[in-house]
């Protein structure tokens, strides 16, 4: 400061400078903090989930380890994999890496026989429940394929009857069945006694047009997908409607029809298999926010995105590409198993940049 200023004047000037600086910092700091918070959101929660191809198994045929129209894939507590085939009317059991172990089932209506086996549910005691669609029943087996019991008293709409059921899920909140032909969801207790039901045919929040895909999150909320209406409806475990999300289209977060299957992982991420015209698996949070997808497109008409492994001849779908995918399941490590029905195979994908699903 200039030497001719008095001590009092110097103090006044210093006080003015410090006060001005303090006010400036007060005005600027919130904007700095907001910028940091936004950056954290952009690089963290909003990052898209990504998966890498791991392995595949299966081919077209009727022998062990082969499929014609594979439909569902499920796991028991030891990691064994079970696949239903709705054309061969059987269930096949594999190791977690895809090595064939055994198969059971044949066409018919007797115990242990199937007419279009659809979904597979496995309870906490490793009992296998198969939705036997055209026999309008659910059959129960042990892990060796030995028949134990069945539920369903013929085709109908009474409480002890089913009409072309298509999905089943076990949860701490109950056992839920998509009774597709009756346009309703059934809830059973652990003894398979009916405790609740909801839905009727029609368009609306509490009505269904052939509900055929269901799963349950950690809070007991039930997610329902329909054959002829795009999007997902969400209910509490007692059937109270909560919300719906999704619309028709081919963009991220949109669906083509039919939506084939719904699966919820241990982090409450919702995986939805899109329709045959847009074959992919999309991933959402519980509010319908798009998080990522699995599956790369192949346009057979132009060859864009397809492979030609043997020179002249038909184009093929490579690893990570699907033809008419039908079901998806997530194991305890977060690996995603996709039933690639049109290619008669199972494809497995591992999480890359994602949080652990444990």
Put a short name on every predicted segment.
Residues 30-358:
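Eukaryotic scaffold repeat domains enriched in small/polar residues
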Residues 17-27:
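Bacterial N-terminal signal peptides
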Residues 2-5, 33-35:
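Short, aromatic- and cysteine-enriched interfacial helices/patches
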Residues 3-19:
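N-terminal Sec-pathway targeting helices
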Residues 4-8, 25, 46:
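Intrinsic-disorder-associated interaction segments
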